[in-house]
C-alpha cells in the first residue's frame, strides 16, 4: 500500500511539474565577441536551405562547406585552411548566396532600436553582404547589408516588431565589394544569430518543420499529466479504505 501511495504522489507531482514548467531549465545566455545572446546557443541558425556560390573564381572546395555556418561561431583563426576539417566558415563567392533556417527559435523585433540579428563574417578583406529575412522561405524582406566583418542589424528599422517572427535568413555577397578572385572569394560566413529570439515555428512552411505552439501541451505531456492526476486519485481512494 505504501509503495502504491508513493508512486501515486510521484506521478501527481510529475504531472504538476510538467503543467507549470517546474524543473524546465531555461536557455543560458551567452556573450560571444561582445554580443549578448539571451537565448544562448539556441540563437543560431539550425539548418541549411540552399547554398549558391558564384564568381569568376568560385571558392575552393575547403571553403565551400555551407554547414560550417550553422550553430554558434567557431572560427579558429585559420583564414587559409586547406581542408574541410580545418575550415570553420563558408565563402559565398562573388555575388553568391546562402539561405539558412531557424528551427528551434525565430528572429523577431525588440520593439526598440536594439540590434536583433548578428552576422559573424571573418577574413581580412572587407566584404559587404546583403541580408534578407523571410517568415516562410518564399516571400523575402530586404533589411540592408552588413558592411564587412561582423555586424548587427535592427529589424525594427524596417517596420517589424515583437509580433513578427522570421525563420529564414538569406545572405548574398555584394559583388562590388571585396576581391572577385582567390581561394575564398566573397563574404566568409562563420555564423548567424538572433540577438532578439522568438518562439520556434508553429505552422508548416515550405521547408520548415511544424512544431506544437509554445502554449499548447504536446500529446506526451498531456498523457503524463493525466497519469499524474490518476495517480493522485488512486492515492486518495486508498486512504479512504
Question: Can you annotate each of these PLM segments?
Answer:
Residues 203-211:
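Extracellular mucin-like PTS domains
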Residues 2-13:
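Bacterial N-terminal signal peptides that target proteins for export
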Residues 30-200:
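A domain-level signal for the mature, folded cores of soluble proteins
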Residues 215-235:
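A short, hydrophobic C-terminal helix/tail in secreted or cell-surface proteins
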Residues 12-21:
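Bacterial N-terminal signal peptides
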Residues 24-29:
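Sec/Tat signal peptide C-region and signal peptidase I cleavage site
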Residues 237-241:
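Short, charged juxtamembrane terminal tails flanking transmembrane helices
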Amino acid at each position: 500500500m505504501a509503495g502504491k501511495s508513493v508512486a501515486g504522489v510521484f506521478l501527481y507531482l510529475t504531472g504538476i511539474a510538467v503543467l507549470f514548467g517546474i524543473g524546465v531549465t531555461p536557455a543560458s545566455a551567452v556573450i560571444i565577441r561582445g554580443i549578448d545572446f539571451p537565448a544562448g546557443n539556441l540563437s543560431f541558425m539550425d539548418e541549411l536551405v540552399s547554398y549558391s556560390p558564384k564568381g569568376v573564381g568560385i571558392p575552393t572546395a575547403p571553403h565551400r562547406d555551407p554547414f560550417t555556418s550553422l550553430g554558434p561561431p567557431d572560427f579558429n583563426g585559420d583564414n587559409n585552411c586547406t581542408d574541410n576539417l580545418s575550415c570553420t566558415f563558408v565563402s559565398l563567392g562573388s555575388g553568391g548566396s546562402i539561405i539558412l533556417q531557424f528551427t528551434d527559435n525565430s528572429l523577431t523585433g525588440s520593439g526598440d532600436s536594439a540590434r536583433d540579428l548578428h552576422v559573424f563574417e571573418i577574413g581580412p578583406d572587407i566584404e559587404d553582404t546583403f541580408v534578407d529575412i523571410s517568415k516562410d522561405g518564399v516571400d523575402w524582406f530586404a533589411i540592408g547589408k552588413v558592411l564587412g566583418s561582423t555586424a548587427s542589424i535592427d529589424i525594427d528599422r524596417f517596420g517589424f516588431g515583437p509580433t513578427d517572427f522570421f525563420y529564414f535568413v538569406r545572405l548574398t555577397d555584394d559583388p562590388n565589394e571585396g576581391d572577385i578572385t582567390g581561394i575564398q572569394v566573397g563574404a566568409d560566413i562563420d555564423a548567424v544569430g538572433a540577438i532578439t529570439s522568438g518562439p520556434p515555428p508553429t505552422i508548416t512552411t515550405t521547408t520548415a518543420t511544424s512544431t506544437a505552439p509554445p502554449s499548447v501541451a504536446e500529446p506526451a505531456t498531456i498523457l503524463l499529466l493525466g497519469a499524474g492526476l490518476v495517480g493522485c486519485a488512486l492515492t486518495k481512494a486508498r486512504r479512504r479504505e
